[in-house]
């Protein structure tokens, strides 16, 4: 046993690693990397791209404000994540091409992305308005979180993108051939592709204790208004999200293999596109109800196991004691049944991939899509 090694078997540490670039233990190749990079510095000096007399004139004093509409930033959500152009400003000021930058709490590896981007003429010009100090910096990034490494390794790694495109498109085609019907509706006898669906919860009236549709009572669709206070259709009492409870019903969960109290959701709107154009479908017809029933039966037959969220069930985060997490105990609770069928099928296809580098990139593609697939999805242009 050596200092810095995680507690675990050697085989497990090796399986978690991607040597020589990433190791789940002190990296024995680190000194070799640094020695090679130091040699490269000499070549850069001969080419006039760096100076042995480089001096920093003073601290970086400008205000930094970077927009977050950046593909690197938006690919995955991660706390403390910073757009890489913000980091580039510091690197271009404090370092020169070939310098080695170390980030020991790297998170998703945006320091590494910034170090590479310092060699991108377009990005440097957008930041500095001139080409001075342009050139790649070398980055050593480290983080304890496996999810952070998963993101960082792809953002800072080299992959065969042609191979990835072919495989990812093949997976999508295969899944759509099998489950494309989930995202199809019928409009005036014409097949249409579902862009998104709106589902509504049910509310328990604080006065008569009867349950009713939140959408039907709170939403004025014609005027694009969602009322903060809405009336119970049965007794006329005023209700609101602050004072009224959500309706829960006992369901058998086929994935958890147990009866559970869960929110019943009702389809209220379908946004679609067809040959005739785009539109909204407010009244579901029999083909929609048949499709929903087919989704239910397909979901019941899924061959997958339940995974407790963070291994804690509902006792996660800072607000679970208020009951906010009620009904969100397992990972599959975060998905509608329709989307979970698709997510499960795509993941099964990725798991079949034997090329480990390609599999890593496919998993990156898969995890990057989750923010648009689970119930926490929101409007984010």
Question: Language-model segments: which ranges?
Answer:
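Nucleic-acid modification enzymes, centered on SAM-dependent nucleic-acid methyltransferases
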Residues: 1-104, 114-381
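Class I SAM-dependent methyltransferase "Motif I" SAM/SAH-binding loop
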Residues: 105-109
């Amino acid at each position: 046993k050596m200092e810095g090694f995680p507690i675990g078997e050697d085989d497990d540490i090796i399986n978690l690693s991607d040597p020589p670039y990433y190791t789940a233990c002190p990296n024995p190749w680190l000194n070799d990397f640094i020695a090679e990079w130091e040699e490269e510095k000499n070549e850069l000096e001969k080419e006039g791209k760096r100076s042995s007399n480089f001096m920093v004139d003073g601290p970086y004093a400008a205000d930094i404000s970077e927009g977050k509409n950046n593909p690197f930033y938006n690919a995955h959500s991660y706390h403390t994540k910073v757009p890489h152009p913000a980091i580039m400003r510091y690197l271009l000021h404090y370092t020169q091409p070939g310098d080695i930058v170390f980030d020991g709490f790297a998170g998703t590896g945006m320091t590494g992305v910034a170090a590479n981007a310092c060699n991108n003429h377009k990005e440097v010009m957008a930041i500095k308005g001139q080409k001075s100090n342009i050139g790649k910096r070398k980055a050593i990034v480290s983080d304890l979180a496996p999810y952070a490494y998963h993101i960082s390794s792809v953002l800072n790694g080299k992959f065969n993108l042609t191979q990835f495109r072919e495989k990812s498109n093949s997976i999508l085609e295969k899944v759509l051939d099998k489950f494309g019907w989930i995202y199809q509706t019928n409009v005036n006898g014409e097949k249409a592709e579902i862009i998104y669906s709106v589902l509504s919860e049910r509310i328990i009236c604080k006065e008569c204790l009867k349950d009713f549709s939140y959408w039907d009572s709170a939403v004025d669709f014609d005027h694009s208004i969602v009322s903060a206070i809405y009336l119970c259709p049965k007794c006329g009492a005023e209700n609101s999200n602050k004072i009224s409870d959500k309706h829960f019903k006992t369901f058998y969960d086929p994935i958890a293999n147990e009866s559970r109290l869960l929110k019943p959701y009702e389809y209220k709107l379908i946004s679609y596109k067809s040959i005739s154009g785009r539109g909204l479908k407010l009244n579901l017809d029999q083909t929609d109800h048949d499709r929903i029933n087919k989704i239910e039966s397909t979901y019941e037959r899924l061959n997958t196991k339940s995974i407790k969220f963070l291994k804690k069930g509902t006792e996660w985060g800072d607000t679970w004691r208020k009951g906010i997490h009620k009904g969100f105990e397992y990972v599959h609770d975060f998905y509608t049944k329709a989307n979970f069928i698709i997510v499960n099928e795509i993941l099964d296809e990725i798991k079949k991939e034997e090329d480990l580098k390609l599999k890593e990139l496919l998993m990156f593609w898969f995890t990057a899509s989750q923010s648009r697939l689970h119930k926490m999805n929101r409007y984010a242009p």
